[in-house]
């Protein structure tokens, strides 16, 4: 079984597929526990007043908040993956997550300014998802969200429409772009 993830701030669509690209499981998972900001750098530490709930926080306070959020994301992701493993009929061998730059900054003062503050929280989710998969012994694949569906279609050839769009007819809604992206990521990883 291969798992593909299309994540957002605080939640993700997860699709599990068999070796011949049949959808075995699809679900929405929560990636953060309640009561914490889903995008701490963008919404709490960023430069935009409209996103901040209160006065700006300094770097040490933001770093502490990011650490707390990251720990929460790790717990929630681990619990969601435990539920997924229990639900699928065969072992999971790989996890595909959206790609992120290997050289993405880690310094909180750098992360809170453009161009990094708008991407920092997303990178955190990608990193935590990958860490949780690695901890389970899954092979980790990264995909380009803008290209993965086209890459999967090229791999599938004449089967592309049936495989990528067919699950909506077979499984019913929801079957959104996120579902197709996650499924396509499992195909490209195969």
Segments and roles (model prediction):
Residues 1-190:
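Phosphate- and other anionic-substrate recognition elements at nucleic-acid/protein interfaces
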């Amino acid at each position: 079984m291969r798992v593909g993830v299309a994540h957002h701030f605080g939640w993700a669509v997860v699709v599990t597929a068999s070796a011949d690209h049949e959808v075995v499981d699809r679900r929405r998972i929560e990636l953060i526990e309640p009561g914490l900001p889903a995008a701490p750098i963008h919404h709490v530490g960023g430069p935009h007043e409209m996103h901040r709930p209160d006065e700006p926080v300094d770097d040490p306070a933001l770093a502490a908040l990011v650490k707390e959020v990251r720990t929460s994301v790790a717990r929630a992701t681990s619990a969601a993956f435990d539920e997924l493993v229990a639900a699928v009929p065969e072992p999971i061998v790989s996890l595909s997550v959206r790609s992120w730059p290997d050289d993405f900054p880690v310094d909180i003062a750098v992360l809170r300014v453009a161009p990094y503050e708008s991407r920092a929280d997303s990178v955190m989710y990608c990193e935590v998802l990958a860490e949780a998969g690695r901890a389970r012994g899954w092979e980790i694949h990264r995909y380009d969200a803008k290209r993965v569906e086209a890459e999967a279609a090229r791999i599938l050839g004449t089967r592309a429409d049936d495989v990528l769009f067919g699950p909506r007819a077979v499984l019913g809604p929801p079957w959104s772009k996120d579902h197709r992206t996650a499924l396509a990521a499992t195909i490209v990883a195969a």
